[in-house]
């Protein structure tokens, strides 16, 4: 029998989701000694890359270890949504060559496009990190 990573990993992820395993682990350790994990956030200016996947997997490993030791792990996912990387993506999308062109485009419209891009990418990143098996509080990211 050949190992089929996609099939088996999908089954494991489905099992965790269908049986609320993350929630049960959080409830099991609730009120015990606290461990605060501050997620050094990726930018939401694009899709995840291998470095972010590796980084988040390593963080997940540390948090799982702390949970296995019985600690109540605070594990909210975080994202860096500050302006520059996102603004550059929006400028490229709309062909804006200079910051001086933004008022003509519309400042409110530009800010809305930046917000939309950041939130869309955050949602996709949440899904991608979950697909990697990362257990973090993505609901409150």
Predicted regions and their residues:
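N-terminal, positively charged nucleic-acid-binding surface of large information/translation enzymes
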Residues: 1-141
């Amino acid at each position: 029998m050949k190992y089929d990573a996609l099939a088996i990993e999908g089954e494991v992820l489905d099992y965790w989701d269908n049986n609320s395993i993350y929630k049960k682990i959080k409830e099991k350790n609730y009120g015990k000694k606290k461990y605060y994990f501050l997620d050094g956030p990726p930018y939401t200016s694009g899709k995840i890359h291998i470095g972010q996947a590796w980084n988040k997997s390593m963080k997940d490993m540390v948090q799982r270890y702390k949970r296995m030791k019985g600690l109540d792990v605070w594990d909210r996912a975080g994202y860096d949504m500050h302006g520059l990387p996102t603004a550059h993506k929006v400028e490229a999308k709309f062909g804006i060559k200079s910051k001086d062109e933004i008022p003509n485009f519309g400042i409110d419209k530009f800010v809305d496009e930046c917000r939309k891009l950041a939130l869309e990418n955050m949602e996709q990143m949440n899904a991608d990190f979950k697909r990697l098996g990362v257990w973090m509080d993505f609901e409150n990211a």
